């Protein structure tokens, strides 16, 4: 695939979604609330913004328009929260990770745990996977560096999902529908 690792900013002073709000549904207001943050991040040279939970700002939630996942110890880890949009792409990647022999965990991810991931990514419909090369927490002067080279697990998952989408890999889960 044509993936390139990106740099993203951890946003602590803006929230993507309110607790008990509409973060788990696809509505324009969720995207509108992240426009200022993304513009500010772009001005500082970052490609994306990672939001934390609005209640405590201590747990990873998601990017403005994509879910977060991390890879460590042969495990695919993604946040579980009522304010995160349930992503079909993330659901597909969780299944593919399991198919590839990884353990899959949906759970709270404390910000400090970012330091333990070998790979990280943003996943969604448009890019499937945008590998994260580094996450910058400017408020705490911490950089979580995953390497600007795309990780092997991200590559495998991306190629597998793309292979299913384009008919190069057997669709054992019956995800594809022929439309005539």
Regions picked out by a protein language model, each given a short descriptive name:
Residues 1-180:
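Helix-start/capping segments and mature chain N-termini
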């Amino acid at each position: 695939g044509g993936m390139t690792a990106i740099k993203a900013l951890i946003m602590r002073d803006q929230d993507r979604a309110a607790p008990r709000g509409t973060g788990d549904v696809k509505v324009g207001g969720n995207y509108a609330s992240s426009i200022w943050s993304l513009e500010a991040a772009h001005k500082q040279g970052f490609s994306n913004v990672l939001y934390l939970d609005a209640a405590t700002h201590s747990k990873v939630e998601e990017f403005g328009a994509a879910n977060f996942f991390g890879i460590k110890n042969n495990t695919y880890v993604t946040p579980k929260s009522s304010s995160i949009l349930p992503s079909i792409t993330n659901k597909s990647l969780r299944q593919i990770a399991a198919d590839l022999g990884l353990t899959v965990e949906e759970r709270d991810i404390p910000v400090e745990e970012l330091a333990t991931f070998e790979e990280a990514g943003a996943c969604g419909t448009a890019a499937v996977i945008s590998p994260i090369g580094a996450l910058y927490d400017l408020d705490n002067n911490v950089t979580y560096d995953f390497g600007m080279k795309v990780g092997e697990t991200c590559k495998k998952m991306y190629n597998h999902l793309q292979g299913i989408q384009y008919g190069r890999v057997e669709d054992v889960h019956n995800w594809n529908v022929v439309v005539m």
